[in-house]
Structures are given as C-alpha cells and as structure tokens.
Amino acid sequence: MWKQSNPRINKFVQVYSNNNHVKNCLNRASSKRYLNYIHRVFYKYKLPPELAHLPILESCFDTKADSGHARGMWQFTRSTAEDYGLSVGFFSDDRLNWRKATHSAARYLKKLGERFNRNWELALAGYNGGPSYMERQMKSQGTRNFWKLKLRKETHEYVPKFLAMLKVARNKFPEMYFQGAPRSWASSS
C-alpha cells in the first residue's frame, strides 16, 4: 500500500535519521498517550494505522501548534475545521482540543481516502495541499500517480517526508511507534 523506498523518500530518511525530531515527537506522543487514543479512533473509522503518525509531520504532536493559518495537533485551517464539525471562535477553538480534533481528522482522512479511491499517497497530498488542488493537478497532468505529479514544493515533499518519518520511527523507535496500535498491525510489521 505504501511506497517503501525511492530517492525522494530516501533523502528524508537521511534527514530524519540524523536528528532527534522523530524521537522527540514520539516521546511527546508516548508521554501523553496520544497514539493510544488516535489508534482507537482511526480503527473505528477503518483508516490505515500509519495515518495515526501524521501529527509528527504536522505538529510534532503539539496540541497548541499554530502556524498562522492552521492550528492544533492536526493543523486544521479554520474552514476545514468547521467543515468537519469543530467550532472556531474568538473565545474557544476546538482545533486545540486534540480529542475532538482527532475525530475530525479521522472523518477528513476517511473522506479524502474515498475521494482518491483509497490511494493514500494522493489522500495525504490532498490533506496538505487541498483536495481540489490535487484534483486540478491530476486532471491537467493526466495522471493519478502521486510520484509522477509536479506539485508545489510543500505538497511535493509531504508524502515522501511522511513515508520517511514512518520508516525511521518504525525502525529506530519501535516501542513508541507501535504504542496503541492494533495487535494485528504491530505483529505483521
């Protein structure tokens, strides 16, 4: 289901292997037991368990992360948050409630998976760049192969970064990587 290796992924495997970013994010997730909860929610929505690690890339599991246009562990923009049931107002912002936001992330990822025919590379690119952007690019370039699409830099690098991060986390920190994962998944990897 997931591409395991290519030059774009390997480039980021080198980056993530030579710094402590993945370890620090997994430590934060482990100490707060975020992954246990996220895995349960994603299992309920029948999502690939690897997607539970998306917050490493989005926010390093920082529930208060703020990039200026997106907030929370899942880095939702205001419009996406509201589309998926989160309240965003002056006095309260559900994007910062990681439990509520996790359910919204699961619904959004499920919808992206359906929209892109369970091609999770395209779905992840849609999570980053927006599903309409991805559909325009696929139509104009005549391909549904993520690896052949020419995309803006952030989206072009998003999926290889995610897959590299998964590889480093699984191989270097398995005890944290598999925390809360379904047994069938942990035993088959």
What are these regions (language model features)?
Residues L109-K139:
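Catalytic and binding regions of secreted/periplasmic enzymes and modules that target cell-wall glycans
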Residues S59-D62, T80-A81, G130-Y133, A169:
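Solvent-exposed loop/turn segments at secondary-structure junctions
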Residues K64-H69, R136-K139:
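Short, solvent-exposed loop/turn and secondary-structure capping segments
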Residues H69-F90, T102-L109:
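Substrate-binding/active-site groove segments that recognize
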Residues P160-S189:
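C-terminal amphipathic alpha-helical segment
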Residues N24-L35, K44-L47, D66-W74, D94-T102, ...:
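Solvent-exposed, acidic/flexible segments
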Residues M1-K46, P174-A181:
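An acidic, Gly/Ser/Thr/Pro-rich helix-cap/linker signature
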Residues L47-D62, A123-N128:
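Short, functionally critical alpha-helical segments immediately adjacent to catalytic or ligand/cofactor-binding
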